[in-house]
Amino acid sequence: YENDNYIPMGFTYDYYLTETQYEDTVTPTRSNLLMRALVLTEEDAVAYGQYLTPLPTAELNDLTYTRYTQDCADRRASACTTFEMNSAGFHAEATLDRANLMFFSVPYDDGFTAYVDGQETEILRVDEGLMAVLCPAGTVTIDFVYQPDGIRLSRTVTLAALPVFLLYAGYFAWDEKKKRKH
């Protein structure tokens, strides 16, 4: 079996709709809308709506399989040219004809930090829990670095506890040596 509607990781949209508009749609057809439009919070629609076109009302009802396959083809056409997982997160490259939000179907987590062309950038929580970043026009590199919550604290505690443990172990080794002499 080969999925003819496969979409690579990392792609852009032409349209957006707000979470309220998305929630007002009929539940069985919502998944088709996710191929056509990026779902933004009301606040993100105000801040980033300039990079996308609001989804026309007529587009909310054209949810046929034929249209779905066309939406998949449109997303493939705007997909990243490179996507690689690495030990820290993932790396992607893309060429965009205009500034746009690059969407990744990776669950949003506060542990991620995103860099576009080496500059830290805001990660948007879109499509009810996935991620997107704003990218400028042209060829861009995108890096997401993941560091779990609490890792810095755990490293600090470990480093602080290490000397205490060494002193504790050293004391008992010294005490044991002292007892053997007597």
Kindly label every feature range from the protein language model.
Residues 1, 44-182:
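Active-site-proximal, structured, solvent-exposed surfaces of multi-pass membrane proteins
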Residues 2-70:
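Catalytic cores of secreted or luminal carbohydrate-active enzymes
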